[in-house]
Amino acid sequence: MDLPISNRARHALSAVVAAACLGVSAQASADDATVQAVWTAKPLHFTFMGFTAKYSCDGLADRMRGILLLLGARPDLKLTPVGCSGGFGRPTQFPGVTGTVNVLEPVGEKGPAPDQKPLAAHWQQVVVAPRGEPLKAAGDCELSEQVKTSILPLFATRNIAYNSTCIPHQLTVGGTQLAADVLVPVPQTEPAP
């Protein structure tokens, strides 16, 4: 059954579709744009307080290093395990890490400080608690919660997507998601020989 559509309605519908397409295009180009950013040192003091998963001090330090690098921390970061009572490789009640992490911060309206060298950066989505590894994400449920509240604020982020059905002492497969857009350096292209 064909419904009669007036020319006015047809033009209005075309205008809405065109505006939506232009809006999506403008948003995509804004997301792809480079921004000027500077490395900023931030102190890190993190203690894991979970009941379901247990970490050794070195295991937590390795896991946190991976998360910090994934979020865009400069690779020269150094973490020191703290609160270690179980010995090397043995689970500890409340393991932690401390150190200084260099993260990218967008250059403000005033510009960079005289001792800071700006570099080109862009926003990139990272997934900290992946949906593709449900058992690993279930074990890291409490860690993901603490990363969201204690680690993400150290970074320039946007579009944070977090969902958790964490229950202490239980693995909830597929119950945790943590993703965010973070600033990362634009890869440097090497000149051709």
Annotate each predicted stretch with a short phrase.
Residues 23-26:
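N-terminal signal peptide c-region/cleavage motif recognized by signal peptidases
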Residues 57-61, 65-68, 144-148:
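Extracytoplasmic/secreted envelope proteins and their assembly/folding machinery
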Residues 76-108:
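Short, intrinsically disordered low-complexity segments
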Residues 36-52, 119-135:
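Acidic/histidine-rich, surface-exposed loop or edge segments in extracytoplasmic proteins
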Residues 28-36:
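Cleaved targeting-peptide boundary
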Residues 2-16:
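Bacterial N-terminal signal peptides that target proteins for export
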Residues 137, 146-193:
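Glycine-rich, aromatic-bearing surface loops/beta-hairpins
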Residues 65-73, 152, 156:
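Sec-exported extracytoplasmic/periplasmic mature domains
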